[in-house]
């Protein structure tokens, strides 16, 4: 016998994440990553995600290195635009801001920044695509170690990212995933 009680559970007082991969949605529905169709799908999924008491969202700064065999890669899905100009890295945060705003609109309270290093020992960089001399190019991935030029990249990127998180008043509810 089951008794149904007409009440709602209180709001969770813990962070709860279930990894939702934006690239998988694009692949499944055959839409371009971060096209307007994709953003609408993301909104629908975010709303359902919150209904299931999830309140922290995996945020794909760069293409996730998760669940991918060494040497293979997932569909490119990065919220950060990267350009290499005169040997320096220039970052665009517009898509990340749109993601954050959409998450908040749907009731997501916490943000888990995607993995900064590969699985299985953090030996490699995640896939990062940049505009180099006017063309899109994979500048990091399985072919690049997690040290060297990638360290220079992070030294340029992370201070700018954390400044944006403070500006958007979400630094205190943002967590960084290093590796699995």
Regions found by a protein language model. Name each.
Residues 1-180:
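Aromatic-lined carbohydrate-binding surfaces of glycoside hydrolases
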């Amino acid at each position: 016998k089951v008794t149904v009680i007409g009440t709602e559970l209180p709001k969770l007082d813990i962070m709860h994440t279930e990894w939702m991969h934006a690239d998988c949605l694009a692949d499944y529905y055959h839409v371009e990553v971060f096209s307007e169709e994709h953003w609408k799908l993301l909104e629908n999924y975010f709303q359902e995600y919150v209904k299931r008491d999830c309140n922290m969202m995996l945020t794909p700064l760069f293409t996730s290195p998760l669940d991918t065999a060494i040497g293979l890669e997932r569909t490119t899905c990065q919220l950060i635009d990267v350009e290499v100009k005169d040997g320096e890295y220039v970052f665009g945060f517009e898509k990340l801001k749109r993601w954050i705003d959409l998450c908040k609109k749907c009731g997501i309270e916490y943000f888990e920044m995607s993995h900064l290093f590969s699985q299985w020992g953090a030996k490699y960089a995640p896939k990062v695509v940049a505009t180099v001399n006017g063309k899109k190019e994979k500048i990091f991935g399985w072919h690049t170690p997690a040290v060297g030029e990638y360290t220079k990249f992070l030294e340029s990127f992370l201070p700018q990212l954390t400044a944006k998180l403070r500006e958007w008043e979400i630094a205190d509810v943002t967590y960084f995933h290093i590796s699995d």
